[in-house]
Amino acid sequence: MRIEVAVILALLVISPALSSAGGEEGQNTPVGCQLSFDGELANESVQFQTSLGPRLPGSAASSALRESIKSNLTGWEITEKTHHVNGMVLTNLFATWNPGLGSTVILAAHYDTRGQAENDWNESRRDEPILGANDGASGVAVLLELAKHIPAMNLSHEITLFFTDGEDQGESFDTYALGAEAWADNLSAEEIDSIESFVLVDMVGDSNLTLRKTSPGDTELWNRTIDTILFFEETCGFGDSSYFNFDGMDYIYDDHVHADRLGIPSIDIIDIRYGEGAEFFGGHWHTHNDTADKISADSLQKVGYILESGLLTGDWLDARLPEVSEESKPEPLDNNPPDEEEDTEQDSDDMAVGVLLMGCILLVWGNLAWLLFADKRGEG
């Protein structure tokens, strides 16, 4: 009888300890790998948007898309602002989560499509507007899919999705990105200071996705983005990082330039080489071949993961580097960097758990051995 009791006692003591150890292992998946973005659903949005036809500023298709965006953002604070620019009526659409809570991260994409196809092989169609599956719909699709998952993140700051109008109606640099320019021109100094970062996604659906750093662009945000892409490959097992050209850089005039000129940390995540073997500003760009069949759910997912991970890990926060005078610089740190201290503390915790577990095992099995010995001698 005493042997049966001892065995039961051993199981009661050891099982919770083993379960605890196993539970800790399961909880060690880095938060940056616990992602929910669905590229297939984002691709469905691209197909819907292109089914509306070209989304020129002031058009019925543009209005229909805005209504669809709003219907997909239940619970978000929606704001529309209209601007009259160069004979066009531009409507910027903003969707905000956690309005008024701390500082703001802005994730942006343009929802208008180009009113001409000046690069199309068919000269007779160059004056016709394009469908803009990649140059228009892809960025919007990424933001809408990401928006489904933001409420569950329990973020402690404000998130604004900025759907810009009038980005793609220009003839030269100063006539592009008109909606974003109007937004920037109307910001107060206080509003500018409250914006942590401006992350733009544009032309991110190409099945031959190749991203690279763009200029102008915030160095700190780009460094974090590159670290995230490498982290996906090395830690999360999300595939290789070959879709990012780590050595290249493109100069891009896009919506982000207006945030950048105000000192807001900004980057433009864009693949301007649209199509297999395409050159800079080449391929299907500004042609009637910019259609939904050229879009890859996998490419949308790669970019969606970058944005989602950035929110979960705080990569889009605290990118502004404060100017520090010589007098106010802090004293040098000691020889234990923060991450080394954290590793030491974690190692100590793991050792303590191991010692406790081993102690429990030795105690129980020691008692069991004594009971077996006592039974043999008839002392029990």
Task: Spell out what each predicted region is.
Residues 1-30, 327-380:
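Secretory targeting signatures
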Residues 40-45, 50-54, 76, 91-164:
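Catalytic-core environment of secreted peptidases
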Residues 44-100, 238-242:
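A non-catalytic alpha/beta surface segment that caps or lines the substrate-entry region
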Residues 55-57, 84-87, 99-101, 111-115, ...:
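Solvent-exposed loop/turn segments at secondary-structure junctions
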